[in-house]
A protein has these predicted regions:
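Short glycine/proline- and aromatic-enriched beta-strand/turn motifs that initiate or cap beta-hairpins
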Residues: 20-81
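Gram-negative (and chloroplast) outer-membrane scaffold detector with strong preference
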Residues: 65-159, 188
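Residues on the lipid-exposed face of transmembrane beta-strands in outer-membrane beta-barrel proteins
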Residues: 57-63, 100-104, 117-119, 146-152, ...
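Transmembrane beta-strands of outer-membrane beta-barrel proteins
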Residues: 24-28, 57, 69-73, 111-117, ...
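Outer-membrane beta-barrel translocator domains and adjoining extracellular loop/strand segments
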Residues: 38-45, 82-89, 125-134, 172-178, ...
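Residues that define the transmembrane beta-barrel architecture of outer-membrane proteins
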Residues: 22-24, 51-55, 94-98, 111, ...
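Outer-membrane beta-barrel "beta-signal"
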Residues: 25, 32, 218-230
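Transmembrane beta-strands of outer-membrane beta-barrel pores
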Residues: 30-36, 63, 75-81, 119-125, ...
Length: 230
């Protein structure tokens, strides 16, 4: 069923008369995400994660060719560990997330909206020590994703607001990733736009593995960063 919905969305996107960029453009984003969260396996107590700082990066390419989708890649490192570790209870997370997205612009005025689809890759290891019993989860899966973003610009102020969501569901991993931000463009000309932004991001991951309890992870926290548009 998920495969049928995913295919239908791709066909709908490709056949619709959807807006596109007026010129070729390149967008890049670099942010510092200060997150905490928790790790919990079935039938075990929740273990809070120590607050960490990490880089979250994205790059997008847009063009004026009708029906051909734009492309975007998002990356974040999710390495973390438990806030309070003991010889019997601890969590160690070594995890990377990359989203490969093809999307279309539905609107591109003072109000903008994009919708797309693609693949997400979660790759790494989660080690849960609970009551002295160690369970290791080895994650490496490409899952289909759905992508949407919407935002609004306040004319003549340089201010804008945006919300973005990614949802993926594969055979063993489900992920929900939502973020919202405010941005101020302090450089705005024909060559380049540069903005400073502040936002909040929440990512939830549910994973299954043979002969292991189901795993639930949450990462959440504020971020600050720069956005550049050529």
């Amino acid at each position: 069923m998920r495969t049928q919905l995913f295919t239908a969305l791709l066909l709908g996107l490709g056949l619709s008369s959807i807006g596109h960029a007026d010129v070729i453009g390149l967008k890049a984003d670099a942010s510092y995400w200060n997150f905490d969260g928790y790790s919990q396996s079935a039938n075990a107590s929740k273990q809070d994660l120590d607050r960490q700082g990490t880089a979250q990066l994205s790059v997008a390419f847009e063009h004026p060719v009708p029906l051909l989708p734009n492309a975007k890649i998002k990356y974040v490192n999710l390495d973390s560990n438990s806030e309070q570790s003991t010889p019997l209870n601890a969590v160690d997370i070594e995890l990377n997330n990359i989203d490969y997205i093809l999307y279309y612009e539905l609107l591109d005025t003072i109000v903008h909206a994009d919708i797309g689809a693609g693949l997400t890759n979660l790759d790494g290891t989660v080690r849960n020590l609970n009551a002295g019993a160690l369970t290791q989860y080895d994650l490496d899966e490409y899952s289909p994703l759905l992508y949407a973003t919407a935002g609004v610009k306040l004319p003549f102020t340089g201010m804008s607001a945006k919300a973005e969501a990614v949802y993926s569901h594969g055979s063993d991993i489900k992920k929900t990733d939502v973020q919202a931000e405010l941005q101020y463009d302090f450089i705005d000309n024909l060559l380049v736009d540069v903005g400073a932004k502040v936002g909040y991001r929440i990512m939830n991951i549910d994973a299954e593995q043979n002969n292991a309890p189901d795993l639930e992870l949450e990462f959440k926290g504020p971020y600050i960063g720069l956005d550049i548009h050529f």
